[in-house]
Amino acid sequence: MKFLNKDRVLCIGAHPDDVEYGMAGTFKKCYNTMFEVVVMSGGGDFDSTTTDVDRRGENELVWKMFDGNVKGYVFNKFVKNQDEDSMVNFIETNFNNFDLIVTTPNQDSHFEHRKINNLGPALCRRDLITLVEYRTPSTLNHWIPNHFEGLSKYDYEF
């Protein structure tokens, strides 16, 4: 099965585990779509309990749980220290030929998630690329998704 009938999807997250929380069921269900995850930081700069190496390792373990249709990259800067132009340039320079981009929603309590959401329209400006948002644990309750992928807990267990 394909996600929205797309071949290649770019998933952008602010931190390790953002995309995985919001998209893991879709990764499992839509095994005929290639998902590339770009994490724009190694983790929280005020989190003294883990390191960016720990967080990156966690992501890599999650990506391996899927049937080869998920690969990812973790950028080592903090989102708050990057301006939108440099993040857009980094993504456009290193990742291309996508049918769809997914980002965190603008209706999110975390400022770095909102910053990542702002990248979506800029990345879609040149090509006919669909933009979809995924839910995170910090997404506000009044957010309304522009797509909902139904999952059966019995069909997509890990």
Show which residues each predicted segment covers.
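Short glycine-enriched, charge-decorated loop/helix-capping segments at active-site entrances
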Residues: 77, 147-149
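Active-site beta-strand->loop->alpha-helix modules in alpha/beta enzyme cores, enriched
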Residues: 1-16, 20-133
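Short, flexible loop segments at boundaries between secondary-structure elements
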Residues: 128-145
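Residue-level detector of flexible, active-site-proximal loop/helix-junction positions
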Residues: 44, 79, 138-140, 155
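A conserved mid-domain beta-alpha-beta active-site/ligand-binding segment of alpha/beta enzyme cores
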Residues: 149-158
